[in-house]
Every structure is written in C-alpha cells, then in structure tokens.
Amino acid sequence: MSVVQPAGRRLTVRDIASRKSPAAEPVVCLTAYTAPMARLLDPHVDLLLVGDSLGMVIYGLPTTHGVTVEMMIAHGQAVVRGSSHALVVVDMPFGSYQESPAQAFRNAARILSETGAAAVKLEGGREMAETVAFLVQRGVPVMGHVGLKPQMVHAMGGFRAQGRDEAEAEAVVAETRAIAEAGAFSIVVEGTFEQVAARATREVSVPTIGIGASADCDGQVLVIDDALGLFTDFTPKFVKRYADLASTVSAAAEAYAADVRARRFPAPEHCFGIRKVG
C-alpha cells in the first residue's frame, strides 16, 4: 500500500536530485495526463510525468510521433492544476528539440512558462548532451531519457530492449554518463537489460528512474494507464498491473446501458420534481 505523502510544499528539482544515495528512498513516479488523475496520484508519488505516451494511450496514435507541443502544454496545464505535492515534468515531443539547442530552448521555455511545470524531459544520449547543457545553463531543468527511446523507435528497429551485447551495453552506459555530465537532474532509463541499467546507475551522480530497467535504479516510473489496466492494446513485459479498470469501466457502461434501455434510469431519486405545497 502506498504511503500518503504529508501535505505541504511541492517537491523541487533539488529534492529529486538529492535522492541518489543507496540509503535514499526510491523516487516514485507515474505518468498523468489529466487534472482528475493527477489529483488521485499526487498524494502518493514524488514526480508526475506528463509523458508523450499520451499520444498512444489517450489519442490512439500508433507511436508518439504525432504528439505536438500544444498537446503537451494542454495536458501539462491540467496536471499542474490537479496536483500540489509532486514535481511535474513535461515531455518535449518529437521534433521540438532535435534541430538545435536554440529550438529546444524556445520550446522548453514555452512549455515551462505556459504550464507551470518545473522541468522538461527529452530523449537522447551523447548527441543531445550539448542541448541538455544549453538548456540547463539557461535555467531550464532537464530530465534525460536513455536506453530504449520511443521517439526513435523506427531508427532503433522497434520496441526492443537495449544492452543485448557488450557494444550496446557500453553505449547505454556512455549515453547515461554524457547526459548526467551535461547537467540533467535525473535520467529515465527505459527498456534496458537489468545488469546494464544497474551499472549505468552506479556510474552517474544523479538519480536514475527505471522503466523496464532495474530495481537498482534510484526510482521507478510506469505509464498510469498500463498500471491501472486501462490501456489494453498491449502490455509491455515490465508492467505490473495494479488494477483491471478496463473491465470495471466496461461493466459499468454495460450496467448503465441496460438501465437506460429498461427505463430504470433515471429513477425518481435522480429527477427534479415540483414540490407539493399544502
């Protein structure tokens, strides 16, 4: 059972960055895309990630490539409004930062100023280190994302775990180190062989947040729709389902439809009637 966090100030980038030592409590992260969901998750987590995964789980897109800055801003605003405790981080979508550090800064600054979120997340290894440093030097906190990078799914040959051989393992460790040295305050390590993710965690001085990686990471994140059993198109190997809300929602809709068709709903207690006087 989750431990409800005490009410008080919202967690900061510095709070998350400090959770690195083996004695530190692991960082608890979940994705959120709406104010009601953020409100439910906020007391239990340290970080709410407004992930570009919303393109697939909310909008039904086949990949995250169709997600826009405007979509991320709208959902980022909702999550910030719905939370008061967790640090809120917003993904930078595909095409919004890869062209140049200047492009990345323009879009990151817009995301932060229009949402009220504390940080942005971007994918990439050594090729993005210059961009990460450029943003951090200009006051934009950055969470990195290495290993399996969904925005590069086509270039990477699909959704396949990284670190299968020595060359891939070294590449994952090197990109984790490069992003940490560039100034990221934490790094998501996704879809990476356990031993490789554990090694990458040991070799950097900032917290790693695992998703399909290792229990040795400094924190964990899951897509909330996966964890709640709401997204049923497919279930990644690394997902643990904590509920089966798809079945619950379907059963509720079925019961509602039956009541309407049988004229059991609305019942008198659900209707506004005229009071009798005298």
Swiss-Prot record:
InterPro entries in UniProt: Pantoate_hydroxy_MeTrfase, Pyrv/PenolPyrv_kinase-like_dom, Pyrv_kinase-like_dom_sf
Entry's EC annotation: 2.1.2.11
Cofactor(s), names only, from the UniProt record: Mg(2+)
UniProt main location, coarse: cytoplasm
Free-text remark on how the cofactor is bound: Binds 1 Mg(2+) ion per subunit.
Disulfide bond positions: none
Recorded metabolic or biological pathway in which this protein acts: Cofactor biosynthesis; (R)-pantothenate biosynthesis; (R)-pantoate from 3-methyl-2-oxobutanoate: step 1/2
Binding site for Mg(2+): D52, D91, E123
Catalytic activity: 3-methyl-2-oxobutanoate + (6R)-5,10-methylene-5,6,7,8-tetrahydrofolate + H2O = 2-dehydropantoate + (6S)-5,6,7,8-tetrahydrofolate
Residues where 3-methyl-2-oxobutanoate binds: D52, S53, D91, K121
GO cellular component, one term: cytoplasm
GO molecular function, one term: 3-methyl-2-oxobutanoate hydroxymethyltransferase activity
Entry's localization field: Cytoplasm
Function: Catalyzes the reversible reaction in which hydroxymethyl group from 5,10-methylenetetrahydrofolate is transferred onto alpha-ketoisovalerate to form ketopantoate.
Protein name per the record: 3-methyl-2-oxobutanoate hydroxymethyltransferase
